[in-house]
From Swiss-Prot:
Family the entry assigns: Belongs to the filoviridae membrane-associated protein VP24 family.
GO cellular component entries: host cell endomembrane system; host cell plasma membrane; membrane; virion membrane
Name of the gene: VP24
Subcellular location: Virion membrane; Host cell membrane; Host endomembrane system
Quaternary context: Interacts with host importins KPNA1, KPNA5 and KPNA6. Interacts with host STAT1. Interacts with host KEAP1; this interaction activates host transcription factor NRF2 by blocking its interaction with KEAP1.
Name of the featured protein: Membrane-associated protein VP24
Species of the source: Zaire ebolavirus (strain Kikwit-95)
Amino acid sequence: MAKATGRYNLISPKKDLEKGVVLSDLCNFLVSQTIQGWKVYWAGIEFDVTHKGMALLQRLKTNDFAPAWSMTRNLFPHLFQNPNSTIESPLWALRVILAAGIQDQLIDQSLIEPLAGALGLISDWLLTTNTNHFNMRTQRVKEQLSLKMLSLIRSNILKFINRLDALHVVNYNGLLSSIEIGTQNHTIIITRTNMGFLVELQEPDKSAMNRKKPGPAKFSLLHESTLKAFTQGSSTRMQSLILEFNSSLAI
């Protein structure tokens, strides 16, 4: 039976570029230096990454901190008092958040192959390396990943960023303040703080939290401003009050 197609319909290249993402966008983490930090381009999204908060992390880790900050240090002993923990750059924190957003899609949706496999590889690349380019060798993946699929991936990443924005700052009232995602080789924990998002990467068994024999952990801080441009609404009054209540948090 003959079927109708839109094979020769004219499209607006500019409009398609604005809405769509190509595979190379997912496989390139392009970084350029700015006065305050870096500009990062990934999946058709431009992020402004700043150094803000990193000096505080270093001081908390090296015991060079004001007494009023001890609450923050004691809240995360597996990071600040662990000889096996290391501080990474904010660029690393962004990579981990993006990898977590991809993993979140893999967990929540029944994605077909080769899309699921391709996303898993891209997530591992972001999570375990600091290289700017990932070479996707599989031609089958390139052929089957449509513009619509790639745009959906970007859309889901932006939804994940909004989920992070909806978290409450760490507090004593039991409100949700962290997102935790486990992969085969890692545990990712992203926690909302006054200054932004404290990002940590641990072993799958979270051995870093073992007080007697703490395992390895990597962590960093991504400032609030980096993700704020992609969130849908301003903080609610409740969030603002909690931010104020927790102003004694060093970060």
